[in-house]
Amino acid sequence: MDPGECTCMSGGICICGDNCKCTTCNCKTCRKSCCPCCPPGCAKCAQGCICKGGSDKCSCCA
């Protein structure tokens, strides 16, 4: 499995580590994962963005 294409369940154990660049990884332990509310192509997506509640925006891709 490509470490940049992991698919973690929310709250599960993330196996991607700091190299996680997938858009479906919701693990809290994967600090550099993309959050599900991050739009495609967001350059800052892998910088620990956090989704703000039920909105479709996150802290780094407003």
UniProtKB/Swiss-Prot annotation:
One of its GO terms (molecular function) is metal ion binding. GO terms for cellular component: cytoplasm; nucleus. A divalent metal cation 3 binds at C16, C20, C25, C30. It comes from the Eukaryota. Keywords: Copper, Metal-binding, Metal-thiolate cluster, Zinc. A divalent metal cation 7 binds at C51, C58, C60, C61. A divalent metal cation 2 binds at C8, C14, C16, C27. A divalent metal cation 4 binds at C34, C35, C45, C49. One of its GO terms (biological process) is cellular response to copper ion. A divalent metal cation 5 binds at C35, C37, C38, C51. Pfam families: Metallothio (PF00131). A divalent metal cation 6 binds at C38, C42, C45, C61. A divalent metal cation 1 binds at C6, C8, C22, C25. Seems to bind zinc and copper. Could play a special role in regulating zinc metabolism during the differentiation of stratified epithelia. PANTHER family: METALLOTHIONEIN (PTHR23299), METALLOTHIONEIN-4 (PTHR23299:SF12). Belongs to the metallothionein superfamily. Type 1 family. This is Metallothionein-4. It comes from Canis lupus familiaris.
